[in-house]
Amino acid sequence: METRERDLERLIPMHKSGASPRDVVLSVPPSPLASPIHVAGKEAIYKVIRSWASKKFMTGCVILLPIAVTFYFTWWFIHFVDGFFSPIYTHLGINMFGLGFVTSITFIFMVGVFMSSWLGASVLSIGEWFIKKMPLVSYIYSASKQISGAISPDQSSGAFKEVAIIRHPHMGEYAFGFITSTVILRGRAGGEELCCVYVPTNHLYLGDIFLISSKDIIRPNLSVREGIEIVISGGMSIPHMLTTLDSETIHRMLESFGILEFGDVCLSLVLAWT
């Protein structure tokens, strides 16, 4: 052992601080050629792990987000509807979650059954007559009724009669809309049938008014419910291919709504808002 120490003293000079030859040998820095490769390997492994973890995390968010949103709004809706009748049951000493919700759903169903009868329609007509006599309430009720009529199961009375595609806001760009009604424009040349086309945002209300010829209106093979789905989903539920309706199909659809009485040119009232 002493012989090895003497050999090290001859090969390596002693440090001024009095460090032993063994400490001097151990304190020699590593080779500069191996360090960058080692660091680059660590960085590459770190980037791969980070990319993999990021992709898996985003995949989990994409899967769980619609589920969480659905459960949240469903839970909120149940609590909201349950709040109508639950105070009555609480006052009676009955504390059971969901009982108010079941009662509310049953009440809505019974109202639908009653209003479908002749007696219910008569009562509704009398109630609407009183509401229309009120200055401010009549406007709110009329607007709300038109919006609710868009999703009415009775398509003959629905506000949205068929889906339309128009060139808006520039040539080469198209927007979805709904034909809501028809009007007649009378002039010196005679009467022209004009179509009201409503182009909503995903909120389905408010907008600007544009006048567009019916020749620029494209009628796709989509139902009103499918059109509403496309608008609400931001275009994500749109089919990969759209086909336009032929003239005979359009003629039959217009006849079913009773709006074929005048000419071929339509005025499109396009309601859109930014």
UniProtKB/Swiss-Prot annotation:
Q: Identify the InterPro entries for this entry.
A: COV1-like
Record's keyword annotation contains Transmembrane: yes
Q: Keywords for this entry? A: Membrane, Transmembrane, Transmembrane helix
Q: Which domain of life is it from?
A: Eukaryota
User: Which parts pass through the membrane?
Assistant: 61-81, 94-114
Mention any one GO cellular component term assigned to this protein in its UniProt record: membrane
Pfam families, alphabetically?
DUF502 (PF04367)
The residues on the Extracellular side of the membrane are 82-93
Location within or outside the cell? Membrane
Q: What is its main location?
A: membrane
Q: How does it sit in the membrane?
A: Multi-pass membrane protein
Q: Which residues lie on this side of the membrane: Cytoplasmic?
A: 1-60, 115-274
Q: Does the keyword Transmembrane helix apply?
A: yes
Per the record, the similarity remark reads:
Belongs to the plant COV1 protein family.
Protein name, UniProt field: Protein LIKE COV 3
Species source reads Arabidopsis thaliana
